[in-house]
Amino acid sequence: MILTRIILHNYRNIEAAELCPEENFNLLCGDNAQGKTNTLEAIYLLGHFKSFRRGRNEELIGSADRHTRVQGEFLRDGLRETVSITITGDKKNIEINGKRPRQSNEMFGRFPSVLFAPEEVSLPKGFPAGRRALLDRALCQTRPSFLDHARAYQRCLRQRNILLKSGAAAPIVLPWTEELIQTGAMVRLARRRYLDRLLPLLRDIYREICSGRESVNLVYPSESDNLSDLKEELRSNLEREQSRETKYGMTMVGPHRDDPVFMVDDRVLGLYGSQGQQRSFILAFKTAQIIDLEKETGYTPLLLLDDMTSELDRKRQDYFFRFLHQRQGQVFITCTELSPLQNAGFNRMRTFRVREGKLCDYQ
């Protein structure tokens, strides 16, 4: 699968742009704050239907118009497919091949992409929500139905929290507790099964990056892959926290509070790991995600690498560049200088100059 064309209208600082990328390596080069990451974000939007940055949809709209539009054309299984996303205010309209998709599985995982962004390096030391999001984004692309389970859980969670905050009687809260147990167990089961697949890859890749000197693990709070056991576990946890939930007016346990812990040599990476270990872990996770995605779906995802050379030292760059050269697939890389990539052997690539929101072939 490759992206053959992308058209942007009034997207952040990009008033109008059209790119026809190469099927292998594409470089977006320019100074900071010129529009490189915005372009990468627009490509990401075509596959994930939301930005990888925090914020509201309205923030994607530039100043030249009241709406923004991103259109992509893909070659998939020998057939051309189009994706169009229009955002007006807080409303988003998505069309695939000219039609609005009716279900999540018609959208997610159809045009897969994997992002490597500088801010992800801090995830091991950050809040649990960031690590959950990293895991869930990867999971959605191999199991689009996971999004339906996650949304059902969030809807139930919001309603249950409203009742708890209002001091509703236990019989009124009980049906929502039962629904929370059902949907929450499904979310935990999907995460557990994904990690069971990913962990062997993650460990092997990390071992290769660090020349076998260290071992890694990713510990998820729920270890069972049995749905009935997960339901009983969550039920027991909720019963234990009942008094605290009444006191604070919110749901105190569940998938929304789970913390996937990143470990190196049986030590919590967020507490004891070095910056280099954090970078190696995220690099290994992303590489494992790519390999797993290809195995599970049969499609090679687009790789979106945002200023990767600034976050990886020479050794880690060399490892990942070797990985990129060995695989077949489309890659988009942002950078401020060409020389590090040219020195790594990226001589056959299409280079675009990005300056003040305008994109053109590099001269």
UniProtKB/Swiss-Prot annotation:
UniProt-annotated location(s): Cytoplasm
Entry protein name: DNA replication and repair protein RecF
Keywords: ATP-binding, Cytoplasm, DNA damage, DNA repair, DNA replication, DNA-binding, Nucleotide-binding, SOS response
A single GO molecular function term of this UniProt record: ATP binding
UniProt xrefs under InterPro entries: DNA-binding_RecF, P-loop_NTPase, RecF/RecN/SMC_N, RecF_2
PANTHER family: DNA REPLICATION AND REPAIR PROTEIN RECF
Gene3D superfamilies given in the database record: P-loop containing nucleotide triphosphate hydrolases, RecF/RecN/SMC, N-terminal domain
Species for this entry: Syntrophotalea carbinolica (strain DSM 2380 / NBRC 103641 / GraBd1) (Pelobacter carbinolicus)
Binding positions (ATP): 30-37
Family: Belongs to the RecF family.
